Amino acid sequence: IIDPEGYPHYERSVTSLRYGSSSRNKEAWNKRFGNDNMWLSKTQSELASIGFHGTGAFCTNTYSKIQTHNQSNPNAPMTLAPSFGFLSQFRSQNGHAYPGNTSDNELGLVLYSDWAEFCKTYIRSAMASYLNDANVLGFFSDNEINFSSQNSRILDRFLQLTDRTDVAYLEAKKFMEEKNATSVTDNLNSEFAGRLAELYYKGVKEAIKEIDPGMMYLGTRLHGTPKYLQHVVAAAGKYCDIISINYYSRWSPELTTYVKQWGEDWADAPFMVTEFYTKGVEDSDLNNQSGA
């Protein structure tokens, strides 16, 4: 990545930089740091010593502290990449209902005509403190949208809605009629999911381009099935500056198949991995039963 001053930047970040909530965390934090300035100064220095210079999507209540650190330490900043909830906020602020009253179908909200205008309004309010900040690498508009899952295709879900006036049902029905199809296939589902993805990403990208054209759009952290849907990845590549992928369910990267397709065939944009498996070292007291 080329930074705002024209230099190459290798983005290596920790996804979560925030206070721990346990008494053990609090005791250790107070003993080692004692205050936010010391915490962030030491953290920046230690992370930089092993080649990490940024923070990611889950730094709840820490982003403003990082910005304060950056202002006080312009030669030792940490990049920020905050994550937002565009779809859930669109639902609550504009008074829409999830199709079928389930958040699994939240992507159907982009079919409402006020989606694009909402994106502009939301960016101006929720992202105000990050606009025109050179240390903000970019932003994620949502996290792991359910474009489909292994056992639940979005086209099937929309066609099964009982409210025949719902915009999601009507769009799915129209799509099937357009394709002269009577049953859902994986290819049809990928294409339909891609159409919805196009509406979603287009709304966000055009909004940020109007408000802060220097801000990079990092997408929605594709995970699970969605990262394997060609039409979804293509839509992300059309509007995102960098496609973000949360890479789980594989111990080793699929270099000759999907990784190659993401980077060379499916999308006209680079991608970066924003989450992946990691485990504790053998001499730690971690049980290694989880590893996000």
Describe each region flagged by the PLM.
Residues 15-16, 59-62, 139, 143-144, ...:
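Residues that line or immediately flank small-molecule/substrate-binding pockets and catalytic motifs
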Residues 101-112, 129-231:
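Polysaccharide-binding and catalytic clefts of secreted carbohydrate-active enzymes
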